[in-house]
Curated annotation (Swiss-Prot):
Keywords tagged on the record: DNA damage, DNA repair, DNA replication, Ligase, Magnesium, Manganese, Metal-binding, NAD, Zinc
Pfam families associated with the record: BRCT, DNA_ligase_aden, DNA_ligase_OB, DNA_ligase_ZBD, HHH_2, HHH_5, Nlig-Ia
Record-linked SUPFAM superfamilies: BRCT domain, DNA ligase/mRNA capping enzyme, catalytic domain, Nucleic acid-binding proteins, RuvA domain 2-like
Ranges of residues in domain BRCT: 592-670
GO molecular function terms listed in the Swiss-Prot or TrEMBL record: DNA binding; DNA ligase (NAD+) activity; metal ion binding
Leading EC class: ligase
Active site residues per record: K116
Residues binding Zn(2+): C409, C412, C427, C433
Name of the featured protein: DNA ligase
Catalytic activity: NAD(+) + (deoxyribonucleotide)n-3'-hydroxyl + 5'-phospho-(deoxyribonucleotide)m = (deoxyribonucleotide)n+m + AMP + beta-nicotinamide D-nucleotide
GO BP term, example: DNA replication
Amino acid sequence: MTNIQTQLDNLRKTLRQYEYEYHVLDNPSVPDSEYDRLFHQLKALELEHPEFLTSDSPTQRVGAKPLSGFSQIRHEIPMLSLDNAFSDAEFNAFVKRIEDRLILLPKQLTFCCEPKLDGLAVSILYVNGVLTQAATRGDGTIGEDITANIRTIRNVPLQLLTDNPPARLEVRGEVFMPHAGFERLNKYALEHNEKTFANPRNAAAGSLRQLDPNITSKRPLVLNAYGIGIAEGVDLPTTHYARLQWLKSIGIPVNPEIRLCNGADEVLGFYQDIQNKRSSLGYDIDGTVLKINDIALQNELGFISKAPRWATAYKFPAQEELTLLNDVEFQVGRTGAITPVAKLEPVFVAGVTVSNATLHNGDEIERLNIAIGDTVVIRRAGDVIPQIIGVLHERRPDNAKPIIFPTNCPVCDSQIIRIEGEAVARCTGGLFCAAQRKEALKHFVSRKAMDIDGVGGKLIEQLVDRELIHTPADLFKLDLTTLTRLERMGTKSAENALNSLENAKSTTLARFIFALGIREVGEATALNLANHFKTLDALKDANLEELQQVPDVGEVVANRIFIFWREAHNVAVVEDLIAQGVHWETVEVKEASENLFKDKTVVLTGTLTQMGRNEAKALLQQLGAKVSGSVSSKTDFVIAGDAAGSKLAKAQELNITVLTEEEFLAQITR
């Protein structure tokens, strides 16, 4: 082997290891810049010496020419579907069937449990460790050849990370698109007047079935393996869970939520846990997949028609249903945004009865081609506000009415305008508009802003309707007599509200900035502004160039902040708030180079009292930490607030350093 070949082999091996650490272990050992440097070095060498180019090189993910169509591939081992369970009773019946069928029933059945990913099932064949072929599930017997497209997925290894690869290994898994990538893809499509995707599953399907792999390479797809088909020249582990861990060890990504559960009760607990964290996973799932862990028992149980007896999918309640659109109301938000809200025939979706859904804006009404009286597809995912994602136009009745977007505010009758380049139409009434005033005040008292407990939305509405308050500063001028005259406001409730208002006067600069409700300034941006400028006066006096030096503050956000401080009314409100006693301590945050959390993995759990979860996360990231959502042996610190639960228990079990909120704040300030 020549020196060039040795150099190429070493570069490829190093890059494969870095890809494995980044995509499979989620624990990169080098910065992206180092990977990029080696990648470009490898690419340059391969261009100089094309005779040594190999198909499994990290540089060869993209490059195939567009196809005229997909050829078909017959699965040597059929890719079967799963039977479903929709209730605890149906799952228990599944377990009972297993127990009745087994000749020698073990003392306790162990299940390998995993989230049911909402993507596309694929088969990937490795021959002597090199990715050779990939196919869709198709009808279970015949699928489509998507080899060129699968090669573009960054977390799919082109060569297995083992010196002793199987002669043939078929990996089966699910390809899906995480929420963050889906949002980026649709945002790009909107900006370039391209068609958007309705949901991440459609986006993943459309991306995998692109005839041009160069397009697929730009789509943020991810693979999670869930099983093995063909396996030749290798002694596989004897349990399903161990096989998945073996796949992970040779570079194949598996889902981090996979768990072993002993007995039906633990499985049902897993189902509930996954359902509870569903909205925070960052990708779509529609249930759990529950498999007998012991391969020998799987073989004994066998199959029925097109499904295994040893596995089932326990599905979540439906997230999409059909219903009728009865009417549309137009609501006014804190910044004057006019939002059309669909009034629906009540329908049970994902565990709750839904009667309202957002239609977002006029563009969405036009895109959906929706009318009052239509049959619509309603979707509710986790805590997300229900939304209409489709219309059955073929069911449109003759008496359907068009939706007409108003030209004047439905609350104050001010003119509605739409600024060029923005999708949102806005009322021009400002604080003259009672609806905007109410929402601005509700934001001001909210938990992540001034956190004024005892002053809720209904109280704000009464105060505004009776013309008792007009600005946030007016809240601090309320007295016992005024409050006790309101509906459902006894002396005790009024005293509690006044005490909360008094306590809220002592806050942080970041919370105060966020509470002001400056457009585009969220919790994290407010924290960055506070850390950068240190004082309110410095922020107020900053010019556009200085504002854009703050992390995550671009031209648009800087302009919003700059204009806010140039409006005399806003300055007067802020000065009035200070005059009413609102104050904060000046806290300087340590630089990233001198703090405990630089390059460490940190998990937040429980309720923090001094700042919101997003605030703390942004602060840690600013200090150079990686903030993770789950505790593992790779975790360096757990910051535990009030009512910390299972994450704290796991940290203690793994002897991971646990810090209270006070200890955390002491470490990051000086």
